[in-house]
């Protein structure tokens, strides 16, 4: 029988190998905290010394919380969901994760909550990956100047305050002045681009509803579906009934979904409706977490709340795929006061604003755009060349009309030139009126604006202007389709093109009958 011998060196080597290759069990150690205060959508948690800012926490019933305040003895967290089941003394676990949302093409045509969960009853969403809500905005070196137009379909906006892809254009005004209608019509106006199948033309749209009535969100969804625009739109809904934490997070969820497409080389339009309610929700959360209040009781970082959100909208350089995300934030004012805290903050962050005025709205001017204080700082370089060519005089003419109108109200005698300017101004104001859910293609806008600014409608009675425009465009679509196509596909209009437009208008006038039964051609 062979002698069995074990040398000490072999034992030592075996122990060394075992120690080096030892893998401990996964659940070796975890931190568990305790809820000390709960209520009103927030929770104070003791006993999680290693928790990080914006880390997700998990409560006993599976509800998630977001760590916002990291204090010496406790953590202040907002509860993401129903907080009635969270009580003092319950255990809380760290997850080691930050808040993220699923992204991908599966979100098109769907309605989701601020955590990315579907709430439209159409089943689960197939996601491609997950994206953190708090991601750095694109840096200066990966951006490109705005140079492509983003058509809204509104003559007043596309002619005087043009918007480019990658721009942030604020829509501001009192309640019930048509802010949401302008945003929804801009989404609907992207329909033909989407159906063209051209990736460079297609725009994916995201509508973020913050603190809106549930019925309002449902009506927006219905309008988009009826217009055939829901197929390329995602709705992120945080209605008024949702906790303040959801209303605070909803815009970041929408921008995370949009950023995924932007970095993929696609074009995105995102609407935040509206950021006043997000600021109110953030103020409520901050006051509940005992953060020191500042002006109008908003916390000190409320500017950063909006700046870090809106800076994510950008036009990326060709090296980054040339994608873009255009932002249309909406802010509600009180009594047309644009000098309040939140409006001035957002005005200073954005690249321009469309100011909608309740007096104009009530006077029947829709969209109720106040041209005097509405401005687009970067959109001019993105405006279609034909539109730029015909709309140059429009803003000046309207400003002169407003001055003359105020002057004429005193009953003073006006010279012939002033009277002519006043009459043309009345027709231009009438021409810029537009019904909801009826956006105009760019080439038809160009024809309408050119006809108005060059005096081709001066002999049309004011009450017939809109009917004249509608029938003229129908005549052009039927008889001179080639002319509209050449305007749409070309750049600046040549003298020959302008002459062709003038001839077409003259030919149409021969058959247009005014409301008093008179043919314009006879005049």
UniProtKB/Swiss-Prot annotation:
PROSITE patterns with a match to the protein in the record: ATPASE_ALPHA_BETA (PS00152)
> Where the protein is mainly located, per its record?
membrane
Q: What is its EC number?
A: 7.1.2.2
Q: Where in the cell is it found?
A: Cell membrane
Q: Which GO terms describe its cellular component?
A: plasma membrane; proton-transporting ATP synthase complex
Q: Where is this site: Required for activity?
A: 374
InterPro entries per UniProt:
ATP_synth_asu-like_sf, ATP_synth_asu_C, ATP_synth_asu_C_sf, ATP_synth_F1_a_nt-bd_dom, ATP_synth_F1_asu, ATPase_a/bsu_AS, ATPase_F1/V1/A1_a/bsu_N, ATPase_F1/V1/A1_a/bsu_N_sf
Any GO MF annotation of the entry: proton-transporting ATP synthase activity, rotational mechanism
- Annotated ATP binding lies at 173-180
* Alphabetic keyword roster: ATP synthesis, ATP-binding, Cell membrane, CF(1), Hydrogen ion transport, Ion transport, Membrane, Nucleotide-binding, Translocase, Transport
* Reactions this protein catalyses: ATP + H2O + 4 H(+)(in) = ADP + phosphate + 5 H(+)(out)
The role this protein plays is:
Produces ATP from ADP in the presence of a proton gradient across the membrane. The alpha chain is a regulatory subunit.
Cited NCBIfam families: atpA, PRK13343.1
- State the protein's name: ATP synthase subunit alpha
Which gene underlies this protein?
atpA
């Amino acid at each position: 029988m062979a002698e069995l011998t074990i040398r000490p060196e072999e034992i030592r080597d075996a122990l060394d190998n075992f120690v080096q290759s030892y893998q401990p069990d996964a659940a070796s150690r975890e931190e568990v905290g305790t809820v000390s205060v709960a209520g009103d959508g927030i929770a104070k948690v003791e006993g999680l010394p290693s928790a990080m800012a914006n880390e997700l926490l998990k409560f006993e019933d599976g509800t998630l919380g977001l760590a916002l305040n990291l204090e010496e003895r406790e953590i202040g967290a907002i509860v993401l969901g129903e907080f009635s089941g969270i009580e003092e003394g319950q255990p809380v676990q760290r997850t080691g994760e930050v808040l993220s949302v699923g992204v991908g093409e599966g979100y098109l045509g769907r309605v989701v909550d601020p955590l990315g969960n579907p709430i439209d009853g159409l089943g689960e969403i197939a996601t491609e990956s997950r994206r953190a809500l708090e991601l750095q905005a694109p840096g200066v070196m990966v951006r490109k100047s705005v140079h492509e137009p983003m058509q809204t379909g509104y003559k007043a906006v596309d002619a005087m305050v043009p918007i480019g892809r990658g721009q942030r254009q604020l829509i501001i005004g009192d309640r019930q002045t048509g802010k949401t209608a302008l945003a929804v019509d801009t989404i609907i106006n992207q329909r033909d681009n989407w159906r063209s199948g051209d990736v460079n033309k297609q725009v994916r749209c995201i509508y973020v509803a913050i603190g809106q009535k549930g019925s309002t969100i449902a009506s927006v969804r219905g309008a988009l579906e009826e217009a055939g625009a829901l197929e390329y739109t995602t709705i992120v809904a945080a209605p008024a009934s949702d906790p303040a934490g959801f209303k605070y997070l909803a815009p970041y969820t929408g921008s995370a979904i949009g950023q995924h497409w932007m970095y993929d080389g696609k074009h995105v339009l995102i609407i935040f409706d509206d950021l006043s309610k997000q600021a109110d929700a953030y103020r409520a959360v901050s006051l509940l977490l005992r953060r020191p209040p500042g002006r109008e009781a908003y916390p000190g970082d409320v500017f950063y709340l909006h700046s870090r959100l809106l800076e994510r909208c950008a036009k990326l350089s060709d090296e980054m795929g040339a994608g873009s995300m255009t932002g249309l934030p909406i802010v509600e004012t009180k009594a047309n006061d644009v000098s309040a805290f939140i409006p001035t903050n957002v005005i200073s962050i954005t690249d321009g604003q469309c100011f909608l005025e309740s007096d104009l709205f009530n006077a029947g001017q829709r969209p109720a755009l106040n041209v005097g204080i509405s401005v687009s700082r970067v959109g001019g370089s993105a405006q279609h060349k034909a539109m730029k060519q015909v709309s140059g005089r429009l803003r000046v003419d309207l400003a002169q009309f407003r001055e003359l109108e105020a002057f004429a109200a005193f009953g003073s005698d006006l010279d012939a030139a002033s009277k002519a300017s006043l009459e043309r101004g009345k027709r231009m104001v009438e021409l810029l009126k537009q019904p909801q859910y009826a956006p105009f293609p760019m080439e038809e806008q160009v024809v309408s604006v050119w006809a108005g600014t060059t005096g081709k409608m001066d002999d049309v009675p004011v009450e017939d202007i809109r009917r004249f425009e509608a029938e003229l465009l129908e005549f052009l679509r039927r008889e001179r389709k080639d002319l509209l196509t050449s305007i749409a596909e070309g750049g600046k209009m040549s003298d020959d093109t302008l002459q062709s437009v003038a001839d077409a208008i003259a030919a149409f006038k021969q058959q247009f009958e005014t409301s008093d039964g008179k043919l314009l051609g006879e005049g």
